[in-house]
């Protein structure tokens, strides 16, 4: 697992209070990890802070799984 993937997983575990083994790249934040719309906004903000990147609203709407977040951040972080 890449450094970015590990950091994303850590943020998801901390923000959603889920078991680390439940967090896979295929995990959907809402359907699999029990997040609500506010949780997803907070996750996006946490990703922005952790990776020092801005995630535009249109991109944020496409980030629905852990893998989506990892792919976006691998492509757009410094």
Curated annotation (Swiss-Prot):
4'-phosphopantetheine is transferred from CoA to a specific serine of apo-ACP by AcpS. This modification is essential for activity because fatty acids are bound in thioester linkage to the sulfhydryl of the prosthetic group. One of its GO terms (molecular function) is acyl binding. The keyword RNA-binding does not apply. SMART domains: PKS_PP (SM00823). Keywords: Cytoplasm, Fatty acid biosynthesis, Fatty acid metabolism, Lipid biosynthesis, Lipid metabolism, Phosphopantetheine, Phosphoprotein. Disulfide bonds: none annotated. SUPFAM superfamilies: ACP-like (SSF47336). The modification O-(pantetheine 4'-phosphoryl)serine is found at residue 37. GO terms for cellular component: cytosol; membrane. GO terms for biological process: lipid A biosynthetic process. Pathway: Lipid metabolism; fatty acid biosynthesis. Residues 2-77 form the Carrier domain. It is found in: Cytoplasm. Its main location: cytoplasm. InterPro entries: ACP, ACP-like_sf, PKS_PP-bd, PP-bd_ACP, Ppantetheine_attach_site. Carrier of the growing fatty acid chain in fatty acid biosynthesis. NCBIfam families: acyl_carrier, PRK00982.1-2, PRK00982.1-3, PRK00982.1-4, PRK00982.1-5. Belongs to the acyl carrier protein (ACP) family. This is Acyl carrier protein. It comes from Methylorubrum extorquens (strain PA1). The gene is acpP.
């Amino acid at each position: 697992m890449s450094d970015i993937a590990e950091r994303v997983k850590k943020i998801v575990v901390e923000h959603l209070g889920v078991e680390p083994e439940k967090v896979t790249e295929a995990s959907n934040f809402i359907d699999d990890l029990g997040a609500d719309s506010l949780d997803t906004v907070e996750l996006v903000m946490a990703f922005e802070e952790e990776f020092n990147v801005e995630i535009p609203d249109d991109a944020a709407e496409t980030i629905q799984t852990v893998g989506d977040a990892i792919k976006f951040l691998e492509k757009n972080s410094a």
